[in-house]
């Protein structure tokens, strides 16, 4: 089954959106496989966002991520990467549809509440970076009510 990496960014944590965001993924039918609440240091943030290091907004993005604690998670389910991105909404919250996490809870692109893997290969890399000891292997008793 496919897995994705989701991070609730410092603004989402500070604004008390952790429960709401987790609830949306659970209600969709995805399974939480790993979760940690952590303060990210600059070298780790730079490693996570290494693919964006040449962008003019890179330093601001890193400063934003290290400004407070984040909630790092791994979710599992059929099509979880693409569907997770749909639940999250567009990178720019002003372009996000109402009903998405960013559409409902964010305004500025620089404070967009949440990160989600953009592809299966990105998810694999991000999960390995954030959870080097692996994730919890379990199956919800609701699995057969969600999947054929």
From Swiss-Prot:
Keyword Repeat: no
UniProt keyword annotations, A-Z: ATP-binding, Kinase, Magnesium, Metal-binding, Nucleotide metabolism, Nucleotide-binding, Phosphoprotein, Transferase
Entry binding sites for ATP: 9, 57, 85, 91, 102, 112
Gene3D superfamilies: Nucleoside diphosphate kinase-like domain
Active-site residues, record numbering mapped to chain: 115
Cofactor (UniProt): Mg(2+)
PROSITE patterns: NDPK, NDPK_LIKE
PANTHER family hit by this protein: NUCLEOSIDE DIPHOSPHATE KINASE (PTHR11349)
Described purpose of this protein according to its UniProt entry: Major role in the synthesis of nucleoside triphosphates other than ATP. The ATP gamma phosphate is transferred to the NDP beta phosphate via a ping-pong mechanism, using a phosphorylated active-site intermediate.
Name under which the protein is recorded: Nucleoside diphosphate kinase 1
Native organism taxonomy: Eukaryota, Viridiplantae, Streptophyta, Embryophyta, Tracheophyta
